[in-house]
Amino acid sequence: MDVLKILALTAFLVVLAGAGWLVGWVNTPAMPMQQALDFMQTTQEVKVDEGEYITFSGLNANNAKGIIFYPGGRVDPKAYAPLMFELAKRGAFTVIVPMPFNLAVFSPMSASRVIKRYPYIKDWYIAGHSLGGAMACSFVKNSAEDIAGLILLASYPAQGDDLSSNDLDVLSIYASNDGLATVQKIDSTKRLLPPQTVYYCIQGGNHTQFGWYLTQDGDGQADISRQQQQDELLSSILKFIRMKQ
């Protein structure tokens, strides 16, 4: 075998190995804790359905308001079940959108299909954690007329998704000990959000505790419990969408 063929074969094997590593990387998301899986069961208060989407519907609610949720990058969508369950228990219809390869960047416009599937919902909010929030911003940039509000959890818009001139209601919740979506990053991207944006900082919280999965590399150490962070998160969202706690 001549040198050129050897080099070509070597290059092919390197690319193949890299592709295999990438597929393995995107298909090994942070897995949900058992506490999250406990909220994947229908109860007397909330009906849970798992199909193309994971939906939570309060059995004694009118479900006039809906929340579409984009998970964080490489995080199993079930890790957000407790928050979506609690919101549904208080009257919201909540939808977690599983993403291709667990990365919302591959399907930022997924919310459009959700809205069409459930036409009886009067007011839709779109929310997302980390990368999911950034892609929710991308959706709003292109389809703001379909949305009543935007909820960002440890997230901010990409430079190309400037929403500063939008009149949409926006809630940005972040955490003081977040090592990934740091306070500095939140502050430096405020110029990309509308001036009426409501900001709420969870003191002592971190990036990982916005969901129910194990610690991410690079995150800061939380000074409060996961449950306390989740309670503050729930309370802030309910206030924003004007629902009783």
Q: Model-found features: residue ranges?
A:
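A conserved short beta-strand
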Residues: 145-157, 169
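Short beta-strand/loop motif that positions the catalytic acidic residue
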Residues: 166, 172-174
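Short beta-strand element of the alpha/beta-hydrolase
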Residues: 64-72
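Conserved alpha/beta-hydrolase
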Residues: 84-104
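Conserved alpha/beta-hydrolase fold motif
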Residues: 126-127, 150
